[in-house]
Amino acid sequence: EGADIDLGNNTFGGHEALVVFDNVFIPNERVFMCQEYKFAGMMVERFAGYHRQSYGGCKVGVGDVLIGAAALAADYNGVPKASHIKDKLIEMIHLNETLYACGIACSAEGKPTKSGNYLIDLLLANVCKQNVTRLPYEIARLAEDIAGGIMVTMPAEQDLRDDMLGPVVRKYL
């Protein structure tokens, strides 16, 4: 509350929704499955596979931005050529490109189905998901190391606007 810059992107940021269908008419031509329970598990598995495959692209875009920000922070801190900083940036790039490779692999190893759809490789999609549950956090940890503590302990906008704290924050940041 009382902040404009700490809100994130309220137009295009993430969102969740609860959708309730109560007494809704759905025309037959729009019904996807009707009492075909034996296919429900396969449908969920395939949906999850495509969702996991897409992580290989979307999380990597965020990683690219974070890697660029970490490199800029190293530059601002006057240490862009330090070997330990370069090693961390290289590791971040390696981890991020590993995620991308997982997304590409499960797509490239997919096969067409009899119905004309294209099914990604579900095993490799799960490998992609497993890497997505770990590697972005390691990339963020390395970015924190490079940027220094200010990246993770930066004062809030409310502190910046505070009559007593604001001048101190502005002096050092």
Language model segments and positions:
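Alpha-helix capping/hinge segments and adjacent helical runs
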Residues: L123-L173
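Short amphipathic alpha-helical patches
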Residues: V44-A48, E97-T98, P112-G116, P155-R170
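Glycine-rich beta->alpha junctions and the first turn(s) of the following alpha-helix
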Residues: G2-N96
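Long, well-ordered mid-to-C-terminal structural blocks that present hydrophobic/aromatic surfaces
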Residues: V62-E138
